[in-house]
Amino acid sequence: MAAPFALRKIGVPPNSANLTEARRRVFDFFRAACRSIPTIMDIYNLQDVVAPSQLRYAISAQIRNNAHITDPKVIDLLIFKGMEELTDIVDHAKQRHHIIGQYVVGEGLVQNTGNKDQGKTDFLKNFYTSNYF
């Protein structure tokens, strides 16, 4: 688990000089986030809920939501917030249901992992199919 130690050393970087440098930092952040996915999957025991590729998709979707921004200072601020969020997740500052609710259910990435207890009544069947734990 070398990823948590690498993320802790990140401080506030200087502002990007131009849009090209800010773009490079976005790609660096995306690589760091993708490299920490196996650690996150292990820490939060997410193997039964989501696949690593689906988490990569959720990260890229968050980045694409801000693709229209062209101000390097705003991009730097968003990267800083993203690194702070990633550090909190890797340092286990969030609980499993926070991760599932924000990045799995919020993105619609819940995968069906097979037959679970189906329940005896319609109410229980609906409850078990809607409950993502």
From Swiss-Prot:
Q: Which domain of life is it from?
A: Eukaryota
An example Gene Ontology CC term for this record: cytosol
Keyword annotations? Electron transport, Membrane, Mitochondrion, Mitochondrion inner membrane, Respiratory chain, Transport
Cellular location of this protein? Mitochondrion inner membrane
Topology in membrane: Peripheral membrane protein
Subunit-level organization: Complex I is composed of at least 49 different subunits.
Record function comment: Accessory subunit of the mitochondrial membrane respiratory chain NADH dehydrogenase (Complex I), that is believed to be not involved in catalysis. Complex I functions in the transfer of electrons from NADH to the respiratory chain. The immediate electron acceptor for the enzyme is believed to be ubiquinone.
Family named by the database record:
Belongs to the complex I LYR family.
Query: What is the official name of this protein in its record?
Result: NADH dehydrogenase [ubiquinone] 1 alpha subcomplex subunit 6
